[in-house]
């Protein structure tokens, strides 16, 4: 996964609770036809069922619509959620399974962003989507649940976070850009903030960072 990740430093940590509470927006893809332990492409394959006939756009739209609104979700075993003081991924790596608490989430929008593609060689189908959701949502699990609605195993095959904490992808900077700016700042004491990092700069609360330069 890539995309927007707000990072708070110094006095800016005072706004973390507000950033965390905000919703998020993503774009990504769901591949139908197989499932993995992690619900994405990083895990081991645990199920496969050929998609012999590609689902129509209307069928996909109907499946996404079923996952829209106020819904409940079971977090994946490979996640940081704690159960009895242990992270779920600790249980998963030990080969253990535990009962996972339901989470109440809200999916504000879940739509196709372009036509799906069908691979006749692997008999898989890939859906391309955008989703707006509340905090605590596992998009991997949304992908799996879409597959369940359609009657086939599924994984999240790609994901980019477009918006988080009020910041959009266009406002972000890369770690490489930050490192380059820090080098410039150290060599030029008059440069005391990220104000001149250009239109991609995501540091909206610039004044809060001055003491950390």
Where do the PLM segments sit?
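Catalytic/RNA-binding core of pseudouridine synthases
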Residues: 1-213
């Amino acid at each position: 996964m890539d995309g927007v990740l707000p990072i708070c430093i110094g006095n800016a940590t005072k706004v973390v609770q507000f950033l965390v509470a905000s919703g998020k927006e993503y774009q990504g893809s769901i591949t139908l036809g197989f499932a993995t332990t992690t619900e994405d492409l990083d895990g081991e394959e645990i199920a496969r069922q050929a998609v012999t006939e590609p689902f129509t756009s209307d069928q996909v739209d109907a499946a996404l619509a079923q996952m829209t609104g106020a819904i409940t979700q079971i977090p994946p075993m490979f996640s940081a959620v704690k159960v009895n003081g242990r992270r779920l991924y600790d249980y998963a790596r030990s080969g253990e399974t535990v009962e996972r608490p339901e989470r109440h989430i809200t999916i504000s929008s879940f739509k196709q962003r372009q036509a799906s593609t069908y691979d006749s060689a692997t008999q898989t189908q890939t859906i391309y989507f955008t989703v707006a959701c509340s905090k605590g949502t596992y998009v991997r699990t949304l992908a799996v649940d879409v597959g369940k609605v359609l009657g086939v195993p599924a994984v999240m095959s790609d994901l980019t976070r477009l918006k988080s904490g009020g910041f959009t992808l266009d406002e972000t900077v890369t770690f490489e850009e930050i490192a380059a700016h820090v080098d410039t700042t150290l060599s030029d004491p008059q440069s005391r903030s990220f104000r001149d990092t250009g239109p991609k700069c995501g540091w909206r609360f610039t004044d809060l960072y001055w003491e950390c330069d």
